[in-house]
């Protein structure tokens, strides 16, 4: 079993997706004075470290560094400055352990259902925190990036999606959304692209050199049930479990997206969770094509099988009480139990809908007239041909950043999902 995991992670950590390296345009380096790392920066980084965290191969834990006091802070500062001066990290910092964490979904017997977390040396993480703070002071990340940004979080992105749904419904306009999935984004991003992105956003060359030193000659060993595999090199991707990796990844997305973003910001990003928004199907097609081509040129890959499309419109899949509209089948006034046909937009009685039992939200329901006498869910609306390699599934609800977004708007579906999760804890 240990060798199976070793073979899986060795392949994942050393193979890039195919991409054209000629797309990396030459960028000017930002030369500046190399500022020494101060004890105040190191002390602030140590204070941010959590206690009782798993250690790397050396066995040094954060609790030891916190207990070392002023003498330990000075020693760590000297080591970090030596790395900056020499452009090389200690050999022990290059090694790590790889442990499995189940993603919470998928077949538990498949390797793809697990995320490999690297247990790095805690002294290295101190240097990463110092470098991260300095890089954040230099780069300007777009306001539509909510992942790993100060004073931003998942609730902000979810709030914006719901507000857009309400505004579009108020104006009787359709809102098209694409929830784009990036395949193995952190594990497969080429490191040449990372260095290019840092330089493109104006990061000082000495900082780029320090980050490159952190990734030079790195290796890891799989740790499973108290046993450790043979070591293997890691040549692709950013470190899962690293303090600096999230910032490096959003810098990559920021740098490559500047080439095809324009006009009003009609996209939301939370690290590798991307939502594209448009007023029409054609507009959404154009956005998906631009992002897909732009990211795949730089070594990232869009997982089209997991990318979903949602058409948000007023009354999508909802049962309403209204006597103003005739039933699309029998022409009598509709009542409480009615549903809108997604094809002809007529309201249909429950008894004429062909649905047995209580009506449920279904944004792709079609009446018997539109289905040639066989009412049901529309085959046409379940998939939308976007001409980007394959058809994308059109859904009426989607779990985005832990919350449920429904095509009809509102938070009812999210509330039901939370109630179901709560009841599941008692089973």
Short names for language-model regions:
Residues 322, 384-427:
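Basic, alpha-helical interaction scaffolds
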Residues 56, 95-98, 115, 145, ...:
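Catalytic palm active-site di-aspartate
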Residues 323-379:
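PHD-type zinc finger and closely related Cys/His-rich zinc-binding mini-domains in nuclear regulators
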Residues 1-112, 118, 126, 399:
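Surface-exposed loop/turn segments and immediately adjacent short secondary-structure elements
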Residues 131-145, 221, 246-277, 335:
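Active-site palm subdomain of RNA-directed nucleic acid polymerases
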Residues 52-60, 98, 109-119, 156-199:
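Conserved catalytic palm subdomain of right-hand nucleotidyl-transferase polymerases, strongest
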Residues 302-322, 374-394:
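Short, conserved micro-motifs composed of acidic
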Residues 66, 184-201, 274-298, 313-317, ...:
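Catalytic palm subdomain of template-directed nucleic-acid polymerases
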């Amino acid at each position: 079993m240990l060798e199976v995991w070793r073979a899986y992670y060795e392949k994942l950590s050393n193979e890039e997706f195919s991409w054209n390296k000629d797309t990396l345009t030459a960028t000017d380096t930002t030369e500046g004075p190399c500022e020494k790392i101060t004890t105040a920066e190191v002390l602030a980084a140590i204070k941010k470290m959590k206690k009782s965290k798993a250690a790397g191969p050396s066995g040094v834990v954060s609790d030891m560094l916190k207990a070392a006091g002023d003498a330990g802070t000075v020693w760590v500062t000297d080591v970090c400055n030596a790395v900056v001066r020499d452009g090389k990290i200690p050999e022990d910092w290059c090694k790590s352990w790889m442990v499995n964490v189940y993603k919470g979904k998928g077949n538990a017997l498949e390797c793809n259902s697990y995320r490999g977390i690297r247990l790095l040396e805690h002294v290295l993480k101190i240097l990463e925190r110092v470098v991260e703070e300095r890089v954040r002071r230099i780069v300007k990340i777009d306001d539509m990036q909510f992942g790993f940004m100060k004073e931003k979080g998942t609730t902000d992105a979810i709030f914006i999606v719901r507000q857009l749904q309400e505004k579009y419904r108020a104006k009787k306009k359709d809102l098209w959304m694409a929830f784009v999935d990036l395949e193995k984004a952190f594990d497969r991003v080429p490191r040449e692209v990372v260095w290019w992105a840092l330089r493109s956003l104006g990061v000082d060359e000495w900082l780029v050199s320090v980050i490159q030193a952190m990734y030079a000659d790195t290796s890891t060993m799989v740790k499973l049930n108290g046993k450790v595999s043979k070591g293997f090199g890691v040549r692709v991707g950013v470190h899962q479990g690293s303090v600096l990796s999230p910032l490096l990844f959003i810098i990559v997305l920021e740098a490559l997206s500047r080439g095809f973003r324009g006009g009003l910001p009609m996209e939301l990003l939370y690290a590798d969770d991307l939502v594209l928004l448009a007023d029409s199907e054609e507009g959404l097609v154009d956005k998906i094509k631009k992002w897909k081509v732009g990211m795949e040129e730089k070594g990232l890959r869009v997982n089209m099988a997991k990318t979903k499309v949602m058409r948000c419109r007023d009354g999508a899949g909802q049962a309403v009480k209204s006597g103003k509209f005739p039933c699309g089948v029998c022409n009598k006034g509709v009542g409480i139990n009615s549903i809108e046909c997604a094809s002809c937009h007529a309201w249909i009685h429950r008894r004429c809908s062909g649905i047995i039992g209580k009506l449920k939200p279904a944004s792709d329901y079609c009446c018997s007239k539109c289905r040639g006498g066989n009412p049901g869910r529309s085959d046409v609306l379940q998939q939308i041909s976007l001409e980007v390699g394959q058809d994308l599934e059109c859904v009426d609800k989607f779990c985005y950043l832990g919350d449920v977004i429904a095509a009809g708007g509102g938070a009812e579906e999210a509330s039901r999902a939370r109630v179901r999760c709560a009841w599941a804890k008692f089973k």
